[in-house]
Curated annotation (Swiss-Prot):
This is ESX-1 secretion-associated protein EspG1. It comes from Mycolicibacterium smegmatis (strain MKD8) (Mycobacterium smegmatis). The keyword Repeat does not apply. Part of the ESX-1 / type VII specialized secretion system (T7SS), which exports several proteins including EsxA and EsxB. Specific chaperone for cognate PE/PPE proteins, plays an important role in preventing aggregation of PE/PPE dimers. Also plays a role in DNA conjugation, in at least recipient strain. One of its GO terms (cellular component) is cytoplasm. Its main location: cytoplasm. DNA conjugation in M.smegmatis is unidirectional with distinct donor and recipient strains; mc(2)155 is a donor strain while MKD8 is a recipient strain. Mutations in a donor strain that alter DNA transfer do not always alter DNA transfer in a recipient strain.
Length: 282
């Protein structure tokens, strides 16, 4: 195994490579060469061949495939931009971990993350054994990063709905929802979206501390898509009690949902101040 990858990845980009597509085995080979072992848990990236001899044979073939793909150079070293993206994924300062259940695609689950290390941002998505990593600009905002995977969506025509999370979670019918002071049309739309979504996303946030320990929030933001449109959910804590708010799924409201989620982290922010200053200079 080579020495751990320590190049600074928070500032200027190395070249015009903005994304890479690899298998899980390919990611494990790249990570091994960079001395990286930990990835966001939701991505499920872990050693899958326990026998060292068999793993050596498989990885040798994977290395040949990665070299043909241009991910590894003639010396077997990862492309610098690929190395920087993998390093961001493995050593992120902040992470949004997302699980996207797609009823409209046979019930499959797509896992994806938004990661920040310094001023660098990477979106990584997993579909079965295929991983796609993409570098993104911080200027597009957290909602823009999440929407690189989810797509724009059509915002549902609903009024905001807020209530104590535990009680709101028990509501299933329009009649129950009208008790929260929203118009019957919005209540019917919410009831239909909640009962028959085409897909839904659960999003949690993590923060990495100096020394390598991490904190994860104990609440989640959400996105639901249905034929009536998209809605987003925002967690809030008021006087120690957890509230949930549902809003039409516009990009601005998704940004509010993600910012509200990040406020549950110990730092209460996606950027450290110096990182924010650096990120928006590029």
């Amino acid at each position: 195994m080579t020495a751990p990858f320590t190049a600074e990845t928070g500032d200027a980009h190395i070249d015009d490579v903005v994304g890479v597509e690899v298998t899980i085995d390919g990611m494990l080979v790249i990570a091994d060469k960079l001395g990286l072992t930990d990835f966001p848990p939701s991505m499920g990236i872990r050693l899958n061949i326990p026998q060292p001899d068999l793993r050596k044979v498989v990885w040798e073939q994977v290395e040949r495939d990665l070299s043909a793909q241009g991910v590894l150079d003639v010396y077997g070293n990862p492309h610098p931009e690929v190395a920087a993206m993998v390093d961001t994924l493995a050593r992120a300062d902040r992470t949004l971990e997302c699980r996207w259940w797609r009823r409209d695609a046979g019930g499959k689950m797509i896992r994806f993350v938004v990661c920040r290390k310094g001023g660098r941002h990477v979106v990584a998505a997993r579909d079965n054994d295929l991983l796609v990593l993409q570098r993104v600009a911080p200027q597009i905002g957290l909602a823009g990063m999440v929407m690189t995977v989810l797509g724009e969506g059509s915002p549902a025509n609903v009024e905001p709905l807020t209530g104590v999370a535990d009680r709101l979670a028990q509501c299933r019918t329009a009649e129950e929802l009208t008790g929260y002071g929203i118009p019957p049309t919005s209540a019917r739309a919410y009831a239909s979206i909640i009962s028959e979504p085409d897909g839904w996303v659960e999003i949690v946030a993590n923060e990495r501390h100096p020394g390598g320990t991490t904190s994860q929030v104990d609440v989640a933001a959400g996105v639901l898509d249905a034929k009536q449109g998209r809605i987003v959910s925002i967690p809030r804590r008021v006087n120690g009690e957890l509230y949930g708010s549902f809003l039409s799924g516009t990009k601005d409201n998704l940004e509010r949902a993600l910012e509200g989620l990040v406020e549950f982290l110990p730092s209460k922010t996606w950027f450290d101040k110096t990182d924010a200053d650096n990120a928006y200079q590029h």
